[in-house]
Amino acid sequence: MDIEDKTSKMHCMKGKHVVIICGVVIAVGLILGLGLGLGLDTKACNPPEVNGQVSTKSPISNTPDVTSPSGSSVFCSAKNDENGPWTHFRLPNYVHPVHYDLHLTPEMEAEVYTGMVNISIRLEEQTTKHLWLHLRETKITEMPQLWTSSGQVIEIKRCFGYEPQEYVVIEAEEDLRPSNYFLSMRFKGYLNGSLVGFYSTTYGENGKIKYIAATDHEPTDARKSFPCFDEPNKKATYTISITHEHDYEAISNMPVEKTISLDNKWTKTIFKKSVPMSTYLVAWAVHQFKYEERISSRGIPLRIYAQPQQINTAIYAANVTKVVFDYFENYFNMNYSLPKLDKIAIPDFGTGAMENWGLITYRETNLLYDSQESAASNKQRVAAVIAHELVHQWFGNIVTMDWWDDLWLNEGFASFFEFMGVNAKEEKWQMLDQILISDLLPVLKEDSLVSSHPITVNVSSPDEITSVFDGISYSKGASILRMLEDWISPECFRAGCEKYLKEHYFKNAKTDDFWKAMEEVSGKPVKEVMDTWTRQMGYPVLKVDLNSTVTQQRFLLDPKADPSKPSSQFSYKWNIPVKWKEGNTSNIIFYNKSELAGITITRPSDLPLNSFLKVNKDHVGFYRVNYEPQVWRALTDIMMKDHQNFNLADRAGFIDDAFALARAGLLKYADALNLTRYLQNEAEYIPWQRAVVAISYIRNMFEDDKALYPKFQRYFGSLVKPIASELKWEXDEDHIKSLLRTTVLEFACKMEDPEALGNASLLFKKWMSGISLDVNLRLLVYRFGMQNSGDEQAWNYMFQKYRTATLAQEKEKLLYGLASVKNITLLNRFLSCIKNTSLIRSQDVFTVLGYISLNSYGKTMAWDWVRLNWEYLVKRYTLNDRNLGRLISRLSGTFNTELQLWQMENFFERYPDAGAGEASRKQALETTKSNIEWLKQYRDDVATWLENSEHSNFA
C-alpha cells in the first residue's frame, strides 16, 4: 500500500470506523503488494511478434533521458538566477516575434532530431540587455547568435535556462534598444518518450516496423520542439524546412515550395511562408503515408493521410471534410485562408485531434472509418471531430484568443458549430438535438459542483492552462452560445460571428470583443447578459410556482454546500432569457438578475385549465427548471398518456432535470422515479439515452447493495424490456435506430435481463467460432458476452484478436471487452500489460484503466493500481498531461464509502503536487463526499419507492 506510516496514524485517529478502515487497508495492501505490485500472472504481456498494427516502441523505462541528449555539447544550461524579469510567467509585451525560419532534421530510427531557428524580433519601447523565450527539455547545442537588422553582430555575454518558467535567457554585452533583431539558435531533442512536442511512433506494415514523426503543441508544447515565444498572442509568420531521408515525405501547415535532393540519403523539403500564426498551431509530420483527396468548391485541395494499408478508411473522412468545409466557408462568409488543408491520422496521439492550421492531426479513432468494421457511433464521432477541427480554422486560427483565460473562444465555438457542420452532411442524425446529450446536459452536472470554475478564468502556469481544457470551456461554452443564438436570433448570431472574424482577422481577441460584435448586430445588451454566464461559475434553477411566477437560485448538487461560495461579483444571479411554451404559444421573457422577486409569465387566456406551461422550451437555456410537486405529477400523467406532446429535447430535459433536482434535495425521489414510468412507451434515442444516464447515478450507488440492487434492476428492466424486445439483436441501416438499439440493449444487459444477456452470450460464442458480428452489436457482445460467459480461453482469444486488429476503433472495442471479464486474475494480467508499450499504446493507457474501473470486479483494482504506480505514470506522462490530470476523477466517480474517501485523501497527501489535475482532485473529493451523504439521505427513500413499485402496476 502506498501509504506512509505517519499519515496512516493521523487518519486512523479520525473516524469511528478506524479499526475496520486500518485493518482493511493493511489487508488490501498486503494482497496488492504481493499481487499487483509484483506483476502476478503476466504471461499475456510478453512482447508480441511484429504484426500489422502493434507498436514496438520501447517501454518508457528504457528510453533515454530527454534532458540529456547525447552526442552534442549543451549550451545555456539551467541556472537558478532569479535576478531578472524572466521570473515572470508571462513574456514581456515589448518583445514581438515577427518571423521564424525553422529547419529540422529528424533521424527516424535513432529517434533524435536537430534543428536551427532564426527568429526576426521587433523590440518596442524598452531598452534591455536580456531576451528570453520558451524552451523545455530540448537542448541548445551552440551559443546563440544575435545581430541587428543591418547585419551587425551583437556579442552574447551568457545564456542560461530558467526552468521554473521554462525559459532560455540570453544576455547581450550591450543594450538592445527598440529596433529589429535576428536571433539564431541550434538545438537537439529526442523523438521518443512523449506524445507532445515533436515525437515519433511506430506502426506495422507487411511485417516491418515503420516510423512516423509528428507534432502536438497545444497548449504549451511548441517550446518542447523548438525555442519560441510560446504564447498565443505572439503571432508570427513561419518558413519551415525539413531534411529527411529519401523514402519519407514531409508535410506542414503550408504547401511545399520545393524539394532538394541533398545526397543519396537525404532530401530537404521547403514549405511556403505561412500567414501569422500562434506557436501552438505550428505543425509538421514526416511520414510514409498515402492520401485520399477531395477538392473544395473553391478549389482548395483537402487531403486525408493514413497508413497505406488503411487508406480506404479515409474515404468517409474525405467526403465529410469537403461538405463541412464548404458549409463553413459559406456560413462564416469568409474563405479559408491557406492554399491547402491536410489531415493525418497518427497511430499514437495523446488527444482526440489538434486543429493545426492547414495540417490537422488526429487520433486514428477520430478520423478513420470502415463501414465493415466501424459502428454508427464511430461514424458519428469521426464526423463530429472533423467538423470541430474545421471550425477552428476560423475560430482559433484566423482569430485566436489573446490568452488562455479565454480558451472558450476557441473550444466553446468549435463545440457549438460542430453540430451544425455534421448536420450539413448528415441531415437525418438529429445533430441539432444531440448537442443536449453530448454537451449541455452532461456539463450541467459538472458545473453544479462547488469545485467548478467560470468559463473565463485566470491561469498562470502550464498546469493551470492545461486544466481548463475541460467541459466548462468546451461544453458550457457551446451551450451558452446556443442560448445566445436563440435569444438574439440565428440571423443576428451569424452576422455577429462574421463581423467578429473580419474585425480580428489574423489577430487575437478577447471575450468582450465577441460580445461587442454581437451587440452591434443585434442591438441587445449582450455583454451585460452574457457576463453573468461567463464570469461566474454555475447556473440557476428556476422555480415555477402555481401562479406562473419564476424565481431563481444557484443550483448545487450538494444540498449542504454554501451557495455563496466562492464569492462572485454577480452574487450568483443571472440575466436569463427565459423561453417558454404553452399550447401553441411560445415566447421569450427576460429575467433580469436585479428582479429579486422574480418574474411572472403571462399565460394565454384561451387555454384549457389542465394545459402545461413548459419553461425552457427545447432546453435551450443553460439552467434547470423546478415545478411544484403536483405539477410534476401532472406532467407524469401527461407523459404517460401521450409523451409526444413534448419534443425530443423537452422529454430528455424533463428526465435530466427531475433526477438532478432530486439529488440536490429539491424534488422528492418519488416524483422523479414516477416520471420514468412513461419510458415503457418511449421509442426515441435522445430521451432514452439521457434517461439511462440520469438513472445511472442511482445504479452506481446501489450496485454493491445486495438487498436493494436487484429491486432496482427488476423495475428498470421492466421498463426497457418492451423496446429491447422490439429492436432485437439485429443489424439496421438507420443511424439513429442503431444508436437507440445500442443504448437500450446495453441498459437491458446492465439490468441483467436474461434474454439480453443470453443473446449477448450466444453471439459471443458464435464470434469465438469465427462468425463475424454486425458492427453495431460488436461492442455489446464483446462486453456482455465476456462478462456473462467469458473464461480464460475466451479472454486469450480476444486478446489475440486485439493484437492483430488493424482498425483502431476495433482495437478500442476489444479493449473494453477484455476489461469486462469477471475474473480478478485476468484483470490483473490486463493491468500488467499497461507498462508494455508494445501491447498498449500510450494513448490507450487511460482508456484501459477507465474501462477496468467500470467493471464491478475491477473498479477497486484500477484505483489500487494507479496508487501503486503513480510515480511511474507521472514519469511517463508528466503532471502536465491533461489525461493524467483527469484520471482520479474518472476512476472515483462512483466512490461512496468512508474507506474510499480516506484512501483518496491519503493519496493526495502523499502526492500533493497535482499538476494539471488540481481541479480534478477537488471534484473527486467533492463527488465522493456527496455520494456518501447521498446514501445516508436518500437510500431509504428510493428503497421504499422500489418496494412499492413491486406491489403496484407502475411498470
Curated annotation (Swiss-Prot):
Residues 1-17 are cytoplasmic. Binds 1 zinc ion per subunit. Residues 39-955 are extracellular. N-glycosylated. Glycosylation counts for an increased mass of about 32% of the protein mass (about 48 kDa). The record marks 474 as: Transition state stabilizer. InterPro entries: Aminopeptidase_N-like_N, Aminopeptidase_N-like_N_sf, ERAP1-like_C_dom, M1_APN-typ, Peptidase_M1, Peptidase_M1_aminopeptidases, Peptidase_M1_dom, Peptidase_M4/M1_CTD_sf. It catalyses: Release of N-terminal glutamate (and to a lesser extent aspartate) from a peptide. Glycans are attached at residues 118, 192, 319, 335, 458, 547, 584, 592, 674, 759, 823, 836. Homodimer; disulfide-linked. This is Glutamyl aminopeptidase.
